[in-house]
């Protein structure tokens, strides 16, 4: 679906936006910054359409927004370190978590960044291996390997490490 017209954008926002925001929240752990990052990615997409045109805009926007959210987190981290050095208290820190089961969220958070991102794209956004590979600029084999490792790590963590082979 091309997000090139107002109608396309309205349709995207109505159908994909909530899932993309949820995916970015899961990938980055940034509950409050995810909607802003998704909106920035959409604006960037409209201002400078990527070439070649992505096969799946939801996946493309999720990756772009995840990157924007991570950049914002880095900036906040640098700001927090500077504030600590100045002994200025940070206000408004919200430690709210997703409505996911605590164990599942903890297991997902424990995954390496790329595995977590690939899992969310694949399982939450129902993206194919090829679409994820294209969006992340990696091979399909890399995506498959990361999915396999992520599934193993999640299963081990969620079952208390009581898995065979």
In which residue ranges do the predicted regions lie?
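Arg/Lys-rich amphipathic alpha helix in sigma70-family domain 2
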Residues: 63-85, 97
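Short amphipathic alpha-helical boundary/capping segments
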Residues: 103-112
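Amphipathic, Lys/Arg- and hydrophobic-enriched alpha-helical face
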Residues: 12-31, 48, 62, 108, ...
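Sigma70-family region 2
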Residues: 2, 40-57, 75-76
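A short, charge-rich alpha-helical start-of-domain segment used by transcription regulators
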Residues: 1-22, 32-35, 116
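A short pre-motif secondary-structure segment
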Residues: 118-122
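DNA-recognition helix of helix-turn-helix
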Residues: 66, 136-160
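Short, small-hydrophobic-rich alpha-helical interface motif
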Residues: 20, 24, 34-45, 64, ...
């Amino acid at each position: 679906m091309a997000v090139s017209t107002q109608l396309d954008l309205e349709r995207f926002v109505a159908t994909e936006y909530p899932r993309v925001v949820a995916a970015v929240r899961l990938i980055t752990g940034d509950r409050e910054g995810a909607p802003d990052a998704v909106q920035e990615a959409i604006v960037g997409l409209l201002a400078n359409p990527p070439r070649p045109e992505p096969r799946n805009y939801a996946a493309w926007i999720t990756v772009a927004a995840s990157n924007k959210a991570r950049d914002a987190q880095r900036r906040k981290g640098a700001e927090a370190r500077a504030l600590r050095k100045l002994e200025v208290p940070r206000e408004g820190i919200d430690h709210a978590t997703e409505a996911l089961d605590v164990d599942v969220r903890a297991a997902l958070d424990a995954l390496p960044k790329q595995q977590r991102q690939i899992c969310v794209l694949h399982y939450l956004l129902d993206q194919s291996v090829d679409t994820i590979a294209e969006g992340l600029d990696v091979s399909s084999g890399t995506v498959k390997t990361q999915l396999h490792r992520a599934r193993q790590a999640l299963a081990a963590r969620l079952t208390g490490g009581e898995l065979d082979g």
